[in-house]
């Protein structure tokens, strides 16, 4: 599956970004599986039994649910009220929430968010990851989001689902979706790399696109609510020729 999908990491939650890079480079995820997949919720992967040895990465992570707003942060506001944050918008292609009252910022659980799972303890994340199949905004600031799927999300959506009565865990191991290869894109041989362009969310053109989605100009629409939900804003990505 990893050969078909590509995720992008953002330098918020930088410790988690470095953690998953270390795990990828030591081959931790190779041969593991997506074993818990809940329809309309998440696809979770990793070592379901917790038996695999971590060689170079940290055994546990300090939570980075949110962080202090960095100086000079480029934040493009969506421009509508939000039920989960004082303000929402985009940071370098990532949907994000912000509280200027608290001086905090975080990435949000829109579709395709890449995050680490954890137990009840705040700092119990280590290796288990999940990808959201639909928006799950109520999880914002409760788990650490540090990336998003930017290519191949259709393959994530096609992963075998588990039974709702078993918390989404797939009992039949033969139906698990294997992780054959999990790599940092920069480490992939040049001839095998994908070259993708993401829409510049700091641009005037993107602000115009936001407005066009907030009040759709097509003749089909008779009611225009002057509202846009954060997770309904498309973030265009396109494949470009190899350079």
Language-model segments: which ranges?
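Cyclophilin-like peptidyl-prolyl cis-trans isomerases
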Residues: 1-243
């Amino acid at each position: 599956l990893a050969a078909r999908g590509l995720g992008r990491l953002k330098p918020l939650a930088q410790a988690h970004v470095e953690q998953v890079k270390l795990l990828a480079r030591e081959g931790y995820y190779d041969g593991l599986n997506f074993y818990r997949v809940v329809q309309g919720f998440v696809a979770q992967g990793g070592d379901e039994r917790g038996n695999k040895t971590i060689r170079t990465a940290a055994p546990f992570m300090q939570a980075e649910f949110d962080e202090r707003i960095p100086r000079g942060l480029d934040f493009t506001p969506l421009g509508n009220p939000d039920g989960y944050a004082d303000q929402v918008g985009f940071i370098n292609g990532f949907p994000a929430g912000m509280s200027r009252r608290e001086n905090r910022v975080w990435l949000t659980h829109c579709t395709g968010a890449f995050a680490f799972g954890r137990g009840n303890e705040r700092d119990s994340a280590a290796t288990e990851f999940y990808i959201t199949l639909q928006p799950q905004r109520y999880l914002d600031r409760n788990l650490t989001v540090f990336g998003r799927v930017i290519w191949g999300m259709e393959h994530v959506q096609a992963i075998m689902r588990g039974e709702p009565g078993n918390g989404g865990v797939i009992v039949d191991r033969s139906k698990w979706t294997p992780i054959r290869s999990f790599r940092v894109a920069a480490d992939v041989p040049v001839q095998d790399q994908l070259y993708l362009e993401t829409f510049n969310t700091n641009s005037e053109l993107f602000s115009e696109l936001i407005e066009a989605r907030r009040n759709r100009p097509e003749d089909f629409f008779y009611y225009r609510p002057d509202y846009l939900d954060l997770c309904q804003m498309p973030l265009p990505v396109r494949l470009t020729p190899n350079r």
